Amino acid sequence: MGTQNTPPNFRPISRHDGLFKERVHDSYKSKEKPQEPSVCSQCGAVFHEGRWQWLQTPANAHSLQCLACHRIHDHYPAGFLTMKGEFFLAHRDEIMHLVHNHEQLERKEHPLQRIIAEEEKEGATLVTTTDIHLARGIGEALHHAYQGELDFHYNPEQNLLRVTWTH
């Protein structure tokens, strides 16, 4: 089996009747950027210079609901962080302190990254977040500080991340 010689004037014809990959639909993500400046009517975050920030509200700002407040209102998280294991149960208060500190640090720079809720389930704690990056960041911070097992399951169709930390 050798290589085939292609004639010099040969042009491949591509077919246009193939299957196209379906786009991910995230109803919480706007198709367009908000008008500038805009302010969230619930949390006060300001959309300015292409991103959400914590700023003084400009006098001419448009009022809207940011994506984080929308997810919180609908109880529809993008990130799920489950923490479990004997070490977790023995050091729960200290670990939850790290979780909240990490969220506060991220929220200062990224107003849309917030914890929605915390729930105790069968010896584990579930923390839900408004953003997949926050769930991942908290999981990585836990792993860095305490080791243990860290597992990620990303669902691109729903833009959803499940993080499990066990120790």
Spell out what each predicted region is.
Residues 120-122, 158:
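Short Gly/Ser/Thr- and Asp/Glu-enriched loop/turn motifs at secondary-structure junctions
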Residues 143-150:
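A common structural junction motif
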Residues 75-113, 117-118:
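Surface-exposed, low-hydrophobicity interaction/linker segments
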